[in-house]
Regions:
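Catalytic-core segments of thiol-dependent peptidases
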Residues: 1-58
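Active-site-proximal C-terminal subdomain of hydrolase catalytic domains
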Residues: 52-160
Length: 160
């Protein structure tokens, strides 16, 4: 993971298990973030539990998203969950997130391609996509997810 980021990867999307300071598989933690030397900051989409819990830790004991943002060779922006997220529910949110940014991500859904690509807006769109979706069907997990994923970064950052 670190090699891909150091090579200038534009976007890293991770979907597996996460904890406050790491991704599980492949394992990548705050320690590895500290070792990054890339000059082209990446965009991180972390569809994992707890990686965006800014209330975690004290002082230099950052959560995963915070470490990516604070490290000078880390990320330009991060989307991450502040608490435990739910499989399938977070997948549906991610589908909407990426369909907003790249309209052909889900070719049978929507047809309005837009000229501007704001990841902060994609965060809201992913939640709207989840709400209107008939799947997954457990509304309590959907309700929790609306307040779970946060965009950390410049709200008007555009992807070109």
């Amino acid at each position: 993971m670190g090699c891909a980021i150091n090579d200038g990867t534009f976007l890293v999307q991770h979907r597996d298990h996460g904890i406050f300071q790491a991704w599980n598989n492949p394992y990548f933690s705050n320690k590895e973030i500290n070792d990054l030397y890339n000059e082209d900051l990446t965009f991180i989409m972390s569809a994992n539990c707890q990686t965006g819990d800014f209330s975690y830790g004290n002082g230099d004991d950052d959560c995963f998203a915070e470490r990516f943002l604070r490290d000078e060779n880390g990320a330009v922006t991060v989307v991450a969950a502040s608490q435990v997220s739910y499989s399938y529910v977070n997948d549906t949110y991610v589908w909407g997130f990426f369909d907003y940014l790249w309209n052909d991500f889900m070719p049978n859904y929507g047809s309005n391609d837009i000229d501007f690509k704001y990841p902060a807006f994609a965060n809201g769109y992913g939640k709207y996509f989840l709400k209107q979706s008939s799947w997954p069907y457990l509304s309590i997990h959907k309700d929790l997810t609306y307040n779970l994923f946060h965009y950390f970064g410049d709200a008007y950052l555009q992807l070109n």
